[in-house]
């Protein structure tokens, strides 16, 4: 009887402990399962990390090989031979240094980076075109510039002197933009570098090369540049006395009436608004000729005679052909990238990596 009671008690204890034992076993099994899963996850992450490292290594090697290829290719590019108009000396400048110095000289460093890139590609393209023309004509230099007067190209030292306390900021911004695109040029449908003309501000629409220089260029045709109307200096008025006008026109042999109000008559304008024919006394000139004779900012002008002086009101600044620099900055601020900007102004051109 005592044995039976003892067994019954033992069974009761076992029954009471059984759920606890099961729970502990279940917890242990769960812990083991979690440990196995964690170990598997660690191994997966390690394998993934190895794959990533391998991929990054291969990509880096590929980039290094590509960079070496580019360096070798660009190292074969001839430096530009630049005639310094101030000193009369010819200096050789590497392509990359020229592009950086040209952008620094020709476009405000405060402009958007995409506009600076567009200027860099334009400068490289123009210089390459000039270099090839110079080789054909057996010239001693490719083109001229006047670094001392900040025209066409400047050295880093000249930029440092000009920019002063802003040198690090401005030179750094220009250099970064040039570094990204200095190997690129704009080409025509035959893959040849275009005549990458540019100017400061258009009259609101660019002019064709044919109307300005008499030679048609497939990529230098009128393009919309309405953003230029927001540029500082878009509209300017220059007053000139009759005596000064007469002196400026003397080399043309023009005979002028006694009444100054009868001296000028605009005869014709291009579709972009630039004067293509103007009567000056008994001589007919084009707008570009009168602009150069009188030192006007643009050949899109109006003429009036008020209070004893001539008033020449101009729209834009420059010849108006090709890339408008202020227009490029305007488009950049609207979200356009440098390729879109260049292909907008150089109609039909394509931006690509330069070949040998």
PLM features per residue range, with description:
Residues 1-356:
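Conserved, single-site charged/polar hotspot
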